[in-house]
Structures are given as C-alpha cells and as structure tokens.
C-alpha cells in the first residue's frame, strides 16, 4: 500500500494537497448550524445517485411515463426504496437549503467580502427550486400535469412577451410531449450540470474567504 502511495506522491504531491485541505482554520464560533450547507450537498449527492438509478427504467413519454414510474415502484428490485429516497431527499434538500440561507443571512455571511459567495448561493437556491418544479411533472400523473400547466401558464401575465415565454417553456402552445421532454432534459442534464458548476464556484469562494466571523 505504501508503494502505491509513494507512486502517487512522487507524481502528484498528494500529501501537500491533503495537508492544505486538513489544515484549514475553523473559527471557534462554528456550531452545528454551519453544517446545513454540507447537509444540502449530501442530499444533492443522494439525488444524483437515486435519480441516475431511475433513468434506467423511466420513459419520458406522455404515454409511458406514469406506467414506468409504477414499474419502478412495484417491479424493480428496491425500486420503491430508490424512488422514495429520491423524493424524501428532495424535500430534505429544499428544507436544508432554506435553513442554510437563513443561517447565512442571520449571521451576516453575505456581507463584504463575501458578496459573490452569497450571489452564487442564491443562484443555487433558484436551481434547487427548479429541480422541484421540473421533477414534479415527470410521473405525468394528474398532479404533475396540472402543476406543469399552472406553472408554465404564470408567465402569460407578462406584457408583450408572455405568450412567447409560455410557448418556450412548454415547447408548444399546449402542455404535451414537448413539455415533458423539456422538463426531463432540464431535470436530468441541464440543472445537475449547472448545480455542479455553481457548487464548485461556491466551495472555492468559501475556501478562499473562509467562514464569516460571529456577529
């Protein structure tokens, strides 16, 4: 084992990287509430794992989506557990994200010089809510269908461009296959990619600036 370590150490100097990661100063005022962001990240990783597992069985068509979800719940080995964990961790992720935002706001973590960290965090919050909106429609049951119809119909109140925005979201004038395809693409590819990018930026900023001090 030491030979393997020495091989990597000689080429990558991993000990220096490990020392840098483990030697970061942690302020004495930090408590359990400062773990809310990390819990949110953990929920996101659970979402990725369980969501990836379900893509092997889910079919994003208006005629097969609901049946494929039922198949996951009843016929796939531990499918009920995978989907239930996905749903529970989604709710937990939103809750932890909200509590994290409140903690940062109440402790003044958004103030100079951490404005960019706050802005990136707000973007991540919007992405998290978008996960919920897009994922809610994927079973394509009555609840999901009407939720999509209502959510995508909201921009219609915008003057001049409202109808164009609605058509852009739905993929057509009415809710249908194009809408489900777009929401599935957003939920499984676009939003996870954006989350990964902004999370990386968020962590690098925190790493650079450190944790904010007490009030």
UniProtKB/Swiss-Prot annotation:
Coiled coil: none annotated. Heme c binds at residue 35. Keywords: Cyanelle, Electron transport, Heme, Iron, Membrane, Metal-binding, Photosynthesis, Plastid, Thylakoid, Transmembrane, Transmembrane helix, Transport. Heme b 1 binds at residues 100, 202. Heme b 2 binds at residues 86, 187. Binds 2 heme b groups non-covalently with two histidine residues as axial ligands. Binds one heme group covalently by a single cysteine link with no axial amino acid ligand. This heme was named heme ci. GO terms for molecular function: electron transporter, transferring electrons within cytochrome b6/f complex of photosystem II activity; metal ion binding; oxidoreductase activity. CDD domains: Cytochrome_b_N. Disulfide bonds: none annotated. One of its GO terms (cellular component) is cyanelle thylakoid membrane. InterPro entries: Cyt_b/b6_N, Cyt_B6_PetB, Cytb/b6-like_sf, Cytochrome_b_N_euk/bac, Di-haem_cyt_TM. Its main location: plastid. It comes from the Eukaryota. It is a multi-pass membrane protein. The keyword Electron transport applies. Its cofactor is heme b; heme c. PANTHER family: CYTOCHROME B (PTHR19271:SF16). Heme 1 (or BH or b566) is high-potential and absorbs at about 566 nm, and heme 2 (or BL or b562) is low-potential and absorbs at about 562 nm. Belongs to the cytochrome b family. PetB subfamily. Component of the cytochrome b6-f complex, which mediates electron transfer between photosystem II (PSII) and photosystem I (PSI), cyclic electron flow around PSI, and state transitions. The 4 large subunits of the cytochrome b6-f complex are cytochrome b6, subunit IV (17 kDa polypeptide, PetD), cytochrome f and the Rieske protein, while the 4 small subunits are PetG, PetL, PetM and PetN. The complex functions as a dimer. NCBIfam families: PRK03735.1 (NF002990). This is Cytochrome b6. It comes from Cyanophora paradoxa. The gene is petB.
């Amino acid at each position: 084992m030491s030979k393997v370590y020495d091989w990597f150490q000689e080429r990558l100097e991993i000990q220096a990287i490990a020392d840098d990661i483990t030697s970061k100063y942690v302020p004495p005022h930090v408590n359990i509430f400062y773990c809310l962001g990390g819990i949110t990240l953990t929920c996101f990783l659970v979402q990725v794992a369980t969501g990836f597992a379900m893509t092997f069985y889910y079919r994003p068509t208006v005629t097969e989506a609901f049946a494929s979800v039922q198949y996951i719940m009843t016929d796939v080995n531990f499918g009920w557990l995978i989907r239930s964990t996905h749903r529970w961790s989604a709710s937990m992720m939103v809750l932890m994200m909200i509590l994290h935002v409140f903690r940062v706001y109440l402790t003044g973590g958004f103030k100079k010089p951490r404005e960019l960290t706050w802005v990136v965090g707000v973007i991540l919050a919007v992405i998290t809510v978008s996960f919920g909106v897009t994922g809610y429609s994927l079973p394509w049951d009555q609840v999901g269908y009407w939720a999509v119809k209502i959510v995508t119909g909201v921009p219609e109140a915008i003057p001049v461009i409202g109808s164009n925005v609605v058509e852009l979201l739905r993929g057509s004038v009415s809710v249908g296959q194009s809408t489900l395809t777009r929401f599935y693409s957003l939920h499984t590819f676009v939003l996870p990619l954006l989350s990964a990018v902004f999370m990386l930026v968020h962590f690098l900023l925190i790493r650079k600036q450190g944790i904010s001090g007490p009030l």
